[in-house]
Amino acid sequence: GGDIHEHKLKLIDYNAQNLGLKNVRTLLQNACTIGQKYGGRADRVLIDAPCSGLGVLRHKIDLRWRKQLSDLRTLPALQRRILESASQCVKPGGVLVYSTCTLNDDENSGIVNEFLQKHPEFHVENAAEKLAVPGHEGPFIQLLPQRDGMDGFFIARMKKES
């Protein structure tokens, strides 16, 4: 896993060790440039994109006071850059998963649909079928706190043509 924050990498390492996972490596890495370094080498890429966090407000109450309206305007540009760069890492036949913990369509389906229009080599797979999430229709998974009894998340699964 890669992140620009060292404290997050330490948390990933700690959790991987506690779970007995031996195949997890962490890198201090900017996701906006990762495609240049690892282009076309990955079977699977998971993007946990930085987002407004609107899906986790009930657990992270301080977000209500820390987030600014300007965040909602600037985050999609960062998310686009990350998705663009990370997509370059996926080799033909590989899978790219884009996820956030927000309910904002501009950060979710808006980003993915725009990406898919620019990248015909990727097609969306039905994430709800692949992940066996009952009660969810369509290609994307959008978990809603009021409906699903958990934090809000968005998941899109895309496959790169061989």
Task: Give the location of each predicted region.
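S-adenosylmethionine
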Residues: 1-162
